[in-house]
UniProtKB/Swiss-Prot annotation:
Belongs to the bacterial ribosomal protein bL19 family. This protein is located at the 30S-50S ribosomal subunit interface and may play a role in the structure and function of the aminoacyl-tRNA binding site. It holds the Pfam family Ribosomal_L19. SUPFAM superfamilies: Translation proteins SH3-like domain (SSF50104). GO terms for cellular component: cytosolic large ribosomal subunit. The keyword Ribonucleoprotein applies. InterPro entries: Ribosomal_bL19, Ribosomal_bL19_CS, Ribosomal_bL19_sf, Translation_prot_SH3-like_sf. The lineage of its organism: Bacteria, Pseudomonadati, Pseudomonadota, Alphaproteobacteria, Hyphomicrobiales. Signal peptide: none annotated. Keywords: Ribonucleoprotein, Ribosomal protein. GO terms for molecular function: structural constituent of ribosome. This is Large ribosomal subunit protein bL19. GO terms for biological process: translation.
Length: 146
């Protein structure tokens, strides 16, 4: 590993220790908390939209978020390790089959919607829970008759 890559890895680890970003990918709807400075005041502004791309690696990694503001499409590119990003919230997971969703730029209205990804782990956990409840109900009358 060369010296530059080693320094980048150390910086990434240091920044990641301060703030944890959720694991998100293109197609996910995210809310990015951005620190905005206006004159002497600083505030945190939320920018919510669909992540349409992730690119780069190491310290140079970025993600692009697209939203529709007053009927106009707005895209913003955020560096993952930027000090201006306070945090990222995952609003919902999207089901897509592409890494770059640039085709969304040409779609309008309902055609630009992304279906929500169903989480199989939650579903299987609910099924297991229901089966356990059913077993408890079946076993309970047998103990009551003894």
């Amino acid at each position: 590993m060369n010296i530059i890559a080693q320094l980048e890895a150390e910086q990434c680890a240091k920044i990641a220790a301060k703030r944890q970003l959720p694991a998100f990918q293109p197609g996910d709807t995210v809310r990015v908390m951005v620190r905005v400075t206006e004159g002497t005041r600083t505030r945190v502004q939320a920018y919510e939209g669909v992540c349409i791309a992730r690119s780069g690696g190491g310290l140079n990694e970025t993600f692009t978020v697209r939203k529709i503001s007053y009927g106009e499409g707005v895209e913003r590119v955020f560096p993952v390790y930027s000090p201006l990003i306070e945090g990222v919230e995952l609003v919902r997971r999207g089901k897509v089959r592409r890494a770059k969703l640039y085709y969304l730029r040409n779609l309008r209205g309902k055609a630009a919607r992304i279906t929500e990804k169903k989480d199989q782990r939650k579903k299987s956990a609910k099924i297991v829970e229901k089966e356990q409840e059913a077993l408890v109900r079946v076993e309970a009358p047998a103990h009551a008759t003894e």
